[in-house]
């Protein structure tokens, strides 16, 4: 009888074990939504940080883009006369606009990252930021498209207008300009993704929630 009594499990141990198992499973299930919510919240931050880097690189590379080219223009006797030609981004208004647009976008995104905590405290601020993001994306797109058109003209020229290409003489200038254009178009794509994400987030909120 004593052995039988000792082998029996106390009645209170089974409910306690079940409660511990339930608590453990509940904690694990609660951690998963929290992790997912954190990853979703980090998406705009990552996109904006990448857009800041891309536009800053585009503005810096184009702003520092310059090259000199020396050519023989005449020969007097046996002495060649040379002339040095220099090209800079300031010589083309489209490239100047490109630098300004990318610089504005980089500064804007940096400010949004620094003051993100203050912006998230107000409900209406999300809609305002979304509208500003659309303006910056349009500014970036027009700047990149304008600079790309001028870059294509510099690379291939225009036979009908008798404009000769210059990239055969200013190869480094054109190469650095291509890097700046690629970085700027990357910034446009990132801003587009940021706008789509912001639009989806704002669509989940009803109009009555905005103050």
From Swiss-Prot:
<feature type="region of interest" description="Disordered">
    <location>
        <begin position="1"/>
        <end position="29"/>
    </location>
</feature>
<comment type="similarity">
    <text>Belongs to the Casparian strip membrane proteins (CASP) family.</text>
</comment>
<feature type="topological domain" description="Cytoplasmic">
    <location>
        <begin position="1"/>
        <end position="55"/>
    </location>
</feature>
<feature type="transmembrane region" description="Helical">
    <location>
        <begin position="177"/>
        <end position="197"/>
    </location>
</feature>
<keyword id="KW-1133">Transmembrane helix</keyword>
<comment type="subunit">
    <text>Homodimer and heterodimers.</text>
</comment>
<feature type="transmembrane region" description="Helical">
    <location>
        <begin position="56"/>
        <end position="76"/>
    </location>
</feature>
<protein>
    <recommendedName>
        <fullName>CASP-like protein 1B1</fullName>
    </recommendedName>
</protein>
<feature type="topological domain" description="Extracellular">
    <location>
        <begin position="77"/>
        <end position="94"/>
    </location>
</feature>
<dbReference type="InterPro" id="IPR006459">
    <property type="entry name" value="CASP/CASPL"/>
</dbReference>
<keyword id="KW-0812">Transmembrane</keyword>
<feature type="transmembrane region" description="Helical">
    <location>
        <begin position="95"/>
        <end position="115"/>
    </location>
</feature>
<keyword id="KW-0472">Membrane</keyword>
<dbReference type="InterPro" id="IPR006702">
    <property type="entry name" value="CASP_dom"/>
</dbReference>
<keyword id="KW-1003">Cell membrane</keyword>
<dbReference type="Pfam" id="PF04535">
    <property type="entry name" value="CASP_dom"/>
</dbReference>
<feature type="topological domain" description="Extracellular">
    <location>
        <begin position="145"/>
        <end position="176"/>
    </location>
</feature>
<dbReference type="InterPro" id="IPR044173">
    <property type="entry name" value="CASPL"/>
</dbReference>
<feature type="topological domain" description="Cytoplasmic">
    <location>
        <begin position="198"/>
        <end position="211"/>
    </location>
</feature>
<dbReference type="GO" id="GO:0005886">
    <property type="term" value="C:plasma membrane"/>
</dbReference>
<feature type="compositionally biased region" description="Low complexity">
    <location>
        <begin position="9"/>
        <end position="26"/>
    </location>
</feature>
<feature type="topological domain" description="Cytoplasmic">
    <location>
        <begin position="116"/>
        <end position="123"/>
    </location>
</feature>
<feature type="transmembrane region" description="Helical">
    <location>
        <begin position="124"/>
        <end position="144"/>
    </location>
</feature>
């Amino acid at each position: 009888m004593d052995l039988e009594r000792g082998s029996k499990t106390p009645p209170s141990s089974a409910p306690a074990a079940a409660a511990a198992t339930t608590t453990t499973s509940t904690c694990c299930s609660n951690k998963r939504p929290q992790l997912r919510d954190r990853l979703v919240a980090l998406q705009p931050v990552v996109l904006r940080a990448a857009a800041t880097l891309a536009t800053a690189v585009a503005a810096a590379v184009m702003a520092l883009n310059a090259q000199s080219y020396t050519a023989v223009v005449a020969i007097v006797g046996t002495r060649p006369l040379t002339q040095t030609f220099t090209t800079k981004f300031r010589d083309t208004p489209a490239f100047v606009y490109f630098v300004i647009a990318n610089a504005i976008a980089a500064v804007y995104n940096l400010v949004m990252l620094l003051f993100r905590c203050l912006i998230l405290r107000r409900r209406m601020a999300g809609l305002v930021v979304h509208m500003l993001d659309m303006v910056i994306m349009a500014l970036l797109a027009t700047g990149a498209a304008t600079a790309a058109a001028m870059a294509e003209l510099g690379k291939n020229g225009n036979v009908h207008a008798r404009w000769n290409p210059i990239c055969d003489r200013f190869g480094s200038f054109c190469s650095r300009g291509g890097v700046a254009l690629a970085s700027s178009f990357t910034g446009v794509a990132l801003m587009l993704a940021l706008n789509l994400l912001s639009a989806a987030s704002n669509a989940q909120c009803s109009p009555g929630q905005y103050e």
